[in-house]
């Protein structure tokens, strides 16, 4: 078969017409130095602050320092095989993570990739890790409670939906335990939870996940993990990733709870990055913007109004407010709350729960110090019954602490003082609670009612715990309907007061403990 010249030229023209060229313009640069997870890149003229830079091997770095003749970027992941002279490209994208309901019940890394071996995740889209917090007009005041299930917290330091409540204390004082119990208590409340583990041992995180699974709480929880073995960049970014996942629910008119465990380790990771980028160090060698590091994160936890939710969902969700409640954790050194990072976070948050090692070692657990623990906005969110019954508890404890210090020096005390001391000791004993045993509002109310109305007067100190257990078992057995009513309404009136009094009178007359 022979082709003549016209056929050949026609064939060539046809092929040229069909040839599809897609031109891609990439701003390309060259790595000029690699050290400790930081790369310096020359030639990226148009790069943005916080932009993802594509590296060889399907990895990314984030541009943090934009200098005159080079860009300082932090590598997300392994960097040992990166070398001078390698080509890198701008992506034009800010770091985004997958968000959506598909993440519930899963364990993911900072980038939202599954690390639990349960297969891929079906997400509802992507969200930028850095987002601007809702404005003043878009917010609504906090007036609904988040029940932690702890008597001492829900009575004296109540937390509301959309609040930021700091959990602060030395190592091994029960900070994580309190946060995990708060997640377990949300099983049936409809609040979605996000647990962000920053710089922790992988074995510790595995234990937390196992406990959540045992108590059926993992199904409505997202666990975001940046372990101690991961790069400083991933530890620094983990809280922002978790926050973006929590905001998905907030912006759609739902309630979410996020725990940052802990922000001290995030600040240390950020300090490491900043020093390697040669930013000037400030107090305790932290960079100057370490306050902004935490404030821009914690301001994203808020209660947003129905108009904001309606506008965000383009009218799909109407008449619903959304909230993201944050429980950041800070570890102190030898109880020093006046150090740089603790004071920063105390000033950003709406209150703090201070856990003390001396109380913990004395067997008072949760080791909450009611003297310097405070909730600045949670009082408005407390249920009526808890508000009414918890008033005397804080006063009783404050008087007890004052008298206990005084009684060490006084040999003979009058009867009134002895009575107050005894009552304070019993209330302290009553507020003790085992881990993984959160209590409902009705159970807490019944116990607080007993303390408030003097039913502990003739109970021996050593038997307060067994008195409480027997009382709750009796109420569950004989008065389940009343407990259910209190849990549903949270109301307190003369009728409920009379019924609670009746339960306690009957219990003390007929039961033993």
Curated annotation (Swiss-Prot):
Entries under CDD domains matching the protein: ATP-synt_F1_alpha_C (cd18113), ATP-synt_F1_alpha_N (cd18116), F1-ATPase_alpha_CD (cd01132)
Pfam families registered for this protein in UniProt: ATP-synt_ab (PF00006), ATP-synt_ab_C (PF00306), ATP-synt_ab_N (PF02874)
Name recorded for this polypeptide: ATP synthase subunit alpha
Name of the encoding gene: atpA
A GO cellular component annotation in the UniProt record: plasma membrane
PROSITE patterns associated with the record: ATPASE_ALPHA_BETA
Family statement: Belongs to the ATPase alpha/beta chains family.
InterPro entries attached to this UniProt entry: ATP_synth_asu-like_sf (IPR023366), ATP_synth_asu_C (IPR000793), ATP_synth_asu_C_sf (IPR038376), ATP_synth_F1_a_nt-bd_dom (IPR033732), ATP_synth_F1_asu (IPR005294), ATPase_a/bsu_AS (IPR020003), ATPase_F1/V1/A1_a/bsu_N (IPR004100), ATPase_F1/V1/A1_a/bsu_N_sf (IPR036121)
Subunit note: F-type ATPases have 2 components, CF(1) - the catalytic core - and CF(0) - the membrane proton channel. CF(1) has five subunits: alpha(3), beta(3), gamma(1), delta(1), epsilon(1). CF(0) has three main subunits: a(1), b(2) and c(9-12). The alpha and beta chains form an alternating ring which encloses part of the gamma chain. CF(1) is attached to CF(0) by a central stalk formed by the gamma and epsilon chains, while a peripheral stalk is formed by the delta and b chains.
């Amino acid at each position: 078969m022979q082709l003549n010249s016209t056929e050949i030229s026609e064939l060539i023209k046809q092929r040229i017409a069909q040839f599809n060229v897609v031109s891609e313009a990439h701003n390309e640069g060259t790595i000029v130095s690699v050290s400790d997870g930081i790369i310096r890149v020359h030639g990226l003229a148009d790069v943005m602050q916080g932009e993802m830079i594509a590296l060889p091997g399907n990895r990314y770095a984030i541009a943090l320092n934009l200098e005159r003749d080079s860009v300082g970027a932090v590598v997300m992941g392994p960097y040992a095989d990166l070398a001078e002279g390698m080509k890198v490209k701008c992506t034009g994208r800010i770091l985004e993570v997958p968000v959506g309901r598909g993440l519930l019940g899963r364990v993911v890394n900072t980038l939202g990739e599954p690390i639990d071996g349960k297969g891929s995740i079906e997400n509802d889209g992507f969200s930028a890790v850095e987002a601007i917090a809702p404005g003043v007009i878009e917010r609504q005041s906090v007036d609904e409670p988040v029940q932690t299930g702890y008597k001492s917290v829900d009575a004296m330091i109540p937390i509301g939906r959309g609040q930021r409540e700091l959990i602060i204390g030395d190592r091994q004082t029960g900070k994580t335990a309190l946060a995990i119990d708060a997640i377990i208590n949300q099983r049936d409340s409809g609040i979605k939870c996000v647990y962000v583990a920053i710089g922790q041992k992988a074995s510790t995180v595995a234990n937390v996940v196992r406990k959540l699974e045992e108590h059926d709480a993992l199904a409505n929880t997202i666990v975001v993990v940046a372990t101690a073995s991961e790069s400083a960049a991933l530890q620094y970014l983990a809280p922002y990733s978790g926050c973006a996942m929590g905001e998905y629910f907030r912006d759609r008119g739902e309630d979410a709870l996020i725990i940052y465990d802990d922000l001290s380790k995030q600040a240390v990771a950020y300090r490491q990055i900043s020093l390697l980028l040669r930013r000037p160090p400030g107090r305790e060698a932290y960079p100057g913007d370490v306050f902004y590091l935490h404030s821009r994160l914690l301001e994203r936890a808020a209660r947003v109004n129905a108009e904001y939710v309606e506008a965000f969902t383009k009218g799909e969700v109407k008449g619903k407010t959304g909230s993201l409640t944050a429980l950041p954790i800070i570890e102190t050194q030898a109880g020093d709350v006046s150090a740089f990072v603790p004071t920063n976070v105390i000033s950003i948050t709406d209150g703090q729960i201070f856990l003390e090692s001396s109380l913990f070692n004395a067997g008072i657990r949760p080791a909450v110090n009611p003297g310097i623990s405070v909730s600045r906005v949670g009082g408005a969110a407390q249920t009526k019954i808890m508000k009414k019954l918890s008033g005397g508890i804080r006063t009783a404890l404050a008087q007890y602490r004052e008298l206990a210090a005084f009684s060490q020096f006084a040999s003979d005390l009058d009867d009134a003082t002895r009575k107050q001391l005894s009552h304070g000791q019993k209330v302290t004993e009553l507020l003790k609670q085992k881990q993984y045993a959160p209590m409902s509002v009705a159970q807490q109310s019944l116990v607080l009612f007993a303390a408030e109305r003097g039913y502990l007067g003739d109970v021996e100190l050593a038997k307060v715990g067994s008195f409480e257990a027997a009382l709750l078992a009796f109420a569950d057995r004989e008065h389940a309907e009343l407990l259910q009513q209190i849990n549903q309404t949270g109301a307190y009136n003369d009728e409920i007061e009379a019924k609670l009094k009746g339960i306690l009178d009957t219990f003390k007359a007929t039961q033993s403990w």
